[in-house]
Amino acid sequence: MPAVRILILAACCCWLLLLPVRCCGPGRGPVGGRRRYMRRLVPLLYKQFVPNVPEKTLGASGKSEGKIRRGSERFIKLVPNYNPDIIFKDEENTGADRLMTERCKDRVNALAISVMNMWPGLKLRVTEGWDEDGHHAHDSLHYEGRALDITTSDRDRNKYGMLARLAVEAGFDWVYYESKAHIHVSVNTDNSLGVRSGGCFPGTAMVMMETGKKKPLSELKLGDTVFTTDETGLLIHSVVLLFLHRDPYKTATFVLIEAEGHPTKLLVTPNHLLFIKSSSSTGFQPTFAYRVQIGDLIQIYVNGTQVQSSKVVRVSVDEQTGVYAPMTEHGTLLVDGVLTSCYATVESHTLAHASLAPLRLFQGIASMLPDLHTSDGVHWYCHILYVLAKYVLWWDMP
């Protein structure tokens, strides 16, 4: 039997390698490979920051861990960036501006490609990177190699709003149109759980059962039938197949979303997918929760047989213990009365749903692997998908 299991898993892994390629075609390589979807890029406004939370919260770049001093144990974890497509100002002539964390290096290299694609002939310019001279506030992320100040090589300030938007798309954890002279960007720590975690809801979040009663996610079980919607917005039943992530003891930061005329607040982790209609989109699109802005539309259930649109009136952050990510057979569900995707990390509901097809089609495989589908933590299958996407297919994952 162990040999049979290994063969089955190997066959599934081979299929998984083909799924994303078949759906999206070839990528651009290890850097800048984030899949782009058909939506208009809207420049940031002066003094706007994304996500709409303070920089040093867990929903953005996280807390400061203290200054990194040259020669210290933490200093050796900073890596130099010699990307020829980036101009480093380096006014100190020490090479300090080239030093940054691995995550920061990945993001800025991705941004450099986007800049050249957006404005042929121009390059990204870094005016400030790691700071060892004490020129910033005492808890600045510049002291940790996690923050950069950037411009375009032509220093055209009319481009800075779009440069900030490109930085958001490149995966920086916090982007701020801070000054007329530059854009400020920063990232979370390389070892942060917030960087590697997917998307979930708190255990107190409620789903509506087929009986009409509500049940908290902490009590939801495999095989339960909950409400979701079809393509037209009509309510339908959907069976809970498994938990993509379940950890009752993990503390996480959630995006808190309040909608007009909806009594319940939705709490969801930043990289979870919601169906959002913004001013720049023609319909409801799968969107990371951290991108939600006041004025965007979400789909809520109040009563009757279908969902309705409601305007987002407040976005904030909250920290709670317990994370749950159930997956239904339809890939969607109503959580606290809001229509949500079951998926996270990849900003394509269709692709995520297709990639998890083997779990829906071959439940017998999971039954041959005792406890793997019921244990706490990230589901083993999702972990395989993440590793394949990030390290084999070279996808740019958050």
UniProtKB/Swiss-Prot annotation:
Keyword Hydrolase applies: yes
Signal peptide positions are: 1-23
Question: Where are the residues marked Involved in auto-cleavage as a site?
Answer: 269
The UniProt entry, under SMART domains, shows: HintC (SM00305), HintN (SM00306)
Binding residue positions for Ca(2+) 2: 92, 128, 131, 133
Q: Residue numbers for the site described as Cleavage?
A: 199-200
User: Which residues carry the site feature described as Essential for auto-cleavage?
Assistant: 272
> What are the protein's UniProt keywords?
Autocatalytic cleavage, Calcium, Cell membrane, Developmental protein, Endoplasmic reticulum, Golgi apparatus, Hydrolase, Lipoprotein, Membrane, Metal-binding, Palmitate, Protease, Secreted, Signal, Transferase, Zinc
What's an example Gene Ontology biological process for this entry?
A: positive regulation of smoothened signaling pathway
Cholesterol glycine ester lipid attachment residues: 199
Looking up CDD domains in the UniProt record yields: Hint
Residues bound to Ca(2+) 1: 91-92, 97, 127-128
- A GO MF label: patched binding
Pfam families reported for this sequence: HH_signal, Hint
The record's subunit annotation is: Interacts with BOC and CDON. Interacts with HHIP.
Q: Which PANTHER family does the UniProt record give? A: DESERT HEDGEHOG PROTEIN, HEDGEHOG
Q: What is this protein called?
A: Desert hedgehog protein B
Which species is this record about?
Answer: Xenopus laevis
**Classification of source organism:** Eukaryota, Metazoa, Chordata, Craniata, Vertebrata
